[in-house]
């Protein structure tokens, strides 16, 4: 493959999207209006919440949907597709509607993150790319959020580019990590493309290039006096690394009146080393010197280090963030929820499974989030039919759809719709926020979740309930074996 060739992301689809599309056209179903939902079934790492991310890339993709002459020639060469279908693809573009939760929104299992309303072939062909972006970026944003909360207000930087699973994994992973709370990245191109602050200082190779560790530290301080963070574990952290860093600071920075500087550990017993280093630095008068640590960290290890009293100001987190190593699959799915008949009536559809967790919620839906007026905290999410409204001036009884005897009456609450219009009739109607706005929004929304939902171990199951009307339709479809009545 020519590495300079620009790939057409329209072709980034599972092959069965095309075979189904050809079949829809063959049976004159290409214009049938369909409703698909993107949702996930469980939170990674047995957590209490996830963070939605990836919408900006989906918007760009939808706006650029098309098939090139080369694409058509390739498909013709497969000898599976009719000429009528290939002609259809020549003028292919998206004309449907899309609703989505804003990026940075905390989300929960089985509620729609995206709803697509479009003609059958269009809705089918976008499935793969929508899932790819939502699954990847939501996974990394969620992992970053957990790691940043474990750091208890300390700076977290994303350091994982070299361990990422491909270029997009590094570039978009850094973007998602920033949404989830990371302060910056080591990935330069993510700064160039998205404005994710890129930073870094030195590797062990810098130290090894000089005749001595002290010479390496002096040289770095001379070149970057206002950004001198020295890697102190190339040889012996406490016997040479920290003492040589202090000496370089004294010789180069102190005469310049610079007191802000840093050291970094990338190996060893981090809790022990940082406590010893902090005392050495303070005793030498470098109380403003910051200590950064890296070395295969994640939220569990960071929490453990802080429980042990580690003296750390910032964390560089690499492979276990950028690959979400502990649970590297988000598990989002794209399922048909309804179709329209020739008169425009919405016909609900359901997927039935022996596994109760895989039974889908039918129909064209919307999602509300309820906030307590007393505390400002999120109390529950509520999935209802698209034409149902919630009167938040009246008490509302909600129930667990899997255990309907579990009920709760909400009073004194405000209701907010989570799904917002993104495309109408194929035209973008959504004002894309900046990445900093998304990050700030994410932090604000996380602050509305109770600590019981946020905790790492055995978090509270946040309420995601169905309206009575939606639950009845679901049960009727289940009792009818999935077949819509009428």
Where are these regions (language model features)?
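Short, positively charged
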Residues: 78-86, 166, 394-402
């Amino acid at each position: 493959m020519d590495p300079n060739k620009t790939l057409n992301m329209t072709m980034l689809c599972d092959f069965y999207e095309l075979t189904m599309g050809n079949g829809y056209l063959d049976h004159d179903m290409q214009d049938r209006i369909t409703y698909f939902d993107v949702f996930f079934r469980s939170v990674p790492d047995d957590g209490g919440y996830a963070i939605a991310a990836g919408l900006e890339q989906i918007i760009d993709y939808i706006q650029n949907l098309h098939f090139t002459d080369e694409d058509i020639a390739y498909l013709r060469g497969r000898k599976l597709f009719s000429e009528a279908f290939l002609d259809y693809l020549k003028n292919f573009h998206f004309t449907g509607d899309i609703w989505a939760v804003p990026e940075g929104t905390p989300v929960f299992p089985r509620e729609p993150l995206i709803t697509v309303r479009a003609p059958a072939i269009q809705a089918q062909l976008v499935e793969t790319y929508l899932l790819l972006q939502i699954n990847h970026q939501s996974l990394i944003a969620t992992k970053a959020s957990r790691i940043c909360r474990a750091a208890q207000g300390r700076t977290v930087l994303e350091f994982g580019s070299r361990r990422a699973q491909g270029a997009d994994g590094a570039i978009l992973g850094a973007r998602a990590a920033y949404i989830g709370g990371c302060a910056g990245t080591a990935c330069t191109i993510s700064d160039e493309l998205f404005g994710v602050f890129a930073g870094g200082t030195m590797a062990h190779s810098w130290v090894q290039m000089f005749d001595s560790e002290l010479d390496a530290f002096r040289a770095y301080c001379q070149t970057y006096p206002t950004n001198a963070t020295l890697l102190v574990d190339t040889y012996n952290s406490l016997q040479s690394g920290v003492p040589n860093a202090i000496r370089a600071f004294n010789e180069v920075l102190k005469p310049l009146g610079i007191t802000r500087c840093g050291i970094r550990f990338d190996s060893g017993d981090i809790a022990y080393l940082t406590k010893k280093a902090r005392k050495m630095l303070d005793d030498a008068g470098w109380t403003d010197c910051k200590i950064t640590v890296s070395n295969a960290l994640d939220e569990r290890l960071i929490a453990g280090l802080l429980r042990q009293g580690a003296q750390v100001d910032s964390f560089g987190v690499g492979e276990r963030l950028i690959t979400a190593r502990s649970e590297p699959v988000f598990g989002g799915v794209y399922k048909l929820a309804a179709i329209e008949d020739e008169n425009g009536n919405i016909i609900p559809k359901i997927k039935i499974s022996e596994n109760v967790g895989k039974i889908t919620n039918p129909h064209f839906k919307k999602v509300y989030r309820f906030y307590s007026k007393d505390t400002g905290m999120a109390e529950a999410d509520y999935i209802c039919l698209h034409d149902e409204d919630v009167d938040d001036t009246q008490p509302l009884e909600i129930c667990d759809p899997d255990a309907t005897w579990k009920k709760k009456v909400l009073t004194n609450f405000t209701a907010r719709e989570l799904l917002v219009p993104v495309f109408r009739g194929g035209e973008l109607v959504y004002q894309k926020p900046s990445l900093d706005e998304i990050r700030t929004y994410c932090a604000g929304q996380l602050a509305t979740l109770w600590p019981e939902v946020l905790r790492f171990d055995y978090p509270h199951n946040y309420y995601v309930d169905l309206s009575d009307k939606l639950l009845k339709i679901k049960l009727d479809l289940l009792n009818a074996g999935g077949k819509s009545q009428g």
